[in-house]
Amino acid sequence: MHNDMVLSLQEITRRCRISIMKSSYRSGGHISTSLSCVEILTALYCAEPTRLLKEKIIKKSIDRDIFIMSKGHGENALYSMLIELNYFPKEWLDSHYRKGDFILGGHVDSSVPGVEVSTGALGHGCSVACGMALAKKKLEEPGMVYCLIGDGECSEGSVWEAVIFAINNNLSNLIFIIDDNKIGSLDFVDNYIKFKRSDSFKGFGAHVIEVDGHNIKDINNALNNNSEKFTIIIADTIKGKGVSSVENDPIWHVKKVDEETFNTGKEELGF
């Protein structure tokens, strides 16, 4: 990946973080967990080689790549990315995010253009991703399935069941990406998950890659791995990345941005 491409992708991440800050200032939401996964989404949707092609996703083409956001509370990051790619107008997020019965809710919903699966009940997206990958394999359909999972979400038993299922069925067309931002909804993850997940995943037989979750080039290289095994990418991230007063503080899991924090974001993100 050449430097001009890296700079272009970094500008996309900046715009997405600005969008997250603005909508969280207006309407609240899951700000810190959205900020932590922006580079992951940018690598998935915008880096080369191109994956998750919009025209195939809109048409539900059988050969499309599929993305499932199992950590459905990262909705603001995904909405901001889909706006970047013109799936729906920016005004939807400006005017309707978390407002009544409008489709841009506090967890991703399949009625939103570009969203494959409704999520929010943690751990469920992993199983859906396994089913879709298995179907592609059985039907000999091309295309990858990508599933973004929170590190706190890994306390759900269904995540581990999905991992074992993917390994047993040799789902080499499936990649789990763990947003390892180290903070769950209430506390630091290390306070309730006491073992090293990567060792367990490797012990089960998965191909595990650990990357800097804020380095788009590293994430993209991991996504391009040609392993013949089911792959798990563990992305080392910072919850609240990009806004210093939000970073690494459990209180910001879901919270309306106040004036002082908004001004900090304006200064640090440059808007």
Q: Language-model features: where?
A:
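N-terminal capping segment at the start of a domain
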Residues: 12-28, 179-181
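Generic beta-sheet signal
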Residues: 65-67, 143-147, 174, 228-237
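Glycine-rich beta-alpha junction loops
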Residues: 73-74, 78, 181-182, 215, ...
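Conserved thiamine diphosphate
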Residues: 141, 190-222, 265
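A short, conserved beta-to-alpha structural element at the edge of catalytic cores
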Residues: 168-195, 204
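Glycine/aspartate-rich loop-and-adjacent alpha/beta segment that forms the canonical ThDP
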Residues: 216-271
